[in-house]
Amino acid sequence: MRIAIGCDHIVTDEKMAVSEFLKSKGYEVIDFGTYDHTRTHYPIFGKKVGEAVTSGQADLGVCICGTGVGINNAVNKVPGVRSALVRDMTTALYAKEQLNANVIGFGGKITGELLMCDIIEAFIHAEYKPTEENKKLIAKIEHVESHNAQQTDANFFTEFLEKWDRGEYHD
């Protein structure tokens, strides 16, 4: 199984721990970064993980930022992604079994590394349990997806990053 993983600079260490755990379990990890603590932007990495999952490059995705809120919102903008922000086993299993989630999101400063690893392992092994009700619900979710043609452009964030480098944006 191939698992895409991405994070922002705040949780690089946590992502690396999760990545090493997954590799130790025999999973192929596709790490989209970030790889250090240099200030960066979670939408970039959420988008990369989402695209890897929806293209078939990865089977599942894991996104981590400080609270999980930002990167999870970003990855959910990729058409075909159903990501759940979780911090407990029950929510993760519901997301996979009932909503057929293909990405799982965490707040790396909210949920500890060991718990994230346990939850991810359970998420991987859980199976979607299709029912007429949840199939209809998933279809409704897919119906509200926004298809922004520009987001498939490999340079989608280039202008933003150039402005950032010039100091035109700040937190």
Curated annotation (Swiss-Prot):
Q: Which reaction does it catalyse?
A: aldehydo-D-galactose 6-phosphate = keto-D-tagatose 6-phosphate
The record's family statement is: Belongs to the LacAB/RpiB family.
Q: Which UniProt keywords apply?
A: Isomerase, Lactose metabolism
Question: A GO term (biological process) for this protein?
Answer: lactose catabolic process via tagatose-6-phosphate
Record InterPro entries: LacB (IPR004784), RpiB_LacA_LacB (IPR003500), RpiB_LacA_LacB_sf (IPR036569)
Q: MF terms per GO, please?
A: galactose-6-phosphate isomerase activity; ribose-5-phosphate isomerase activity
Please name the NCBIfam families in this protein's record. Answer: lacB, PRK05571.1, PRK08622.1, PRK12615.1, rpiB_lacA_lacB
Highest rank taxon of the organism: Bacteria
User: Which pathway is recorded for this entry?
Assistant: Carbohydrate metabolism; D-galactose 6-phosphate degradation; D-tagatose 6-phosphate from D-galactose 6-phosphate: step 1/1
**What is the designated name of this protein?**
Galactose-6-phosphate isomerase subunit LacB
Q: How does it assemble?
A: Heteromultimeric protein consisting of LacA and LacB.
**Gene3D superfamilies registered for this protein in UniProt:** Sugar-phosphate isomerase, RpiB/LacA/LacB (3.40.1400.10)
Question: What HAMAP family does its record include?
Answer: LacB
Native organism:
Streptococcus pneumoniae serotype 4 (strain ATCC BAA-334 / TIGR4)
Q: E.C. number, please?
A: 5.3.1.26
The family database entries (Pfam families) matched by this protein are listed as: LacAB_rpiB
